[in-house]
Curated annotation (Swiss-Prot):
It comes from the Eukaryota. This is Allergen Lip b 1. It comes from Liposcelis bostrychophila (Booklouse). Keywords: Allergen. On the 2D-gel the determined pI of this protein is: 3.5, its MW is: 26 kDa.
Amino acid sequence: AVLDTALSGIDKVLHGSIDAHKAD
């Protein structure tokens, strides 16, 4: 859970907030 949250945050930074919303 904690690691998943951290990875999610990194993913948003790498791909951008728009991409993050799309992926979600």
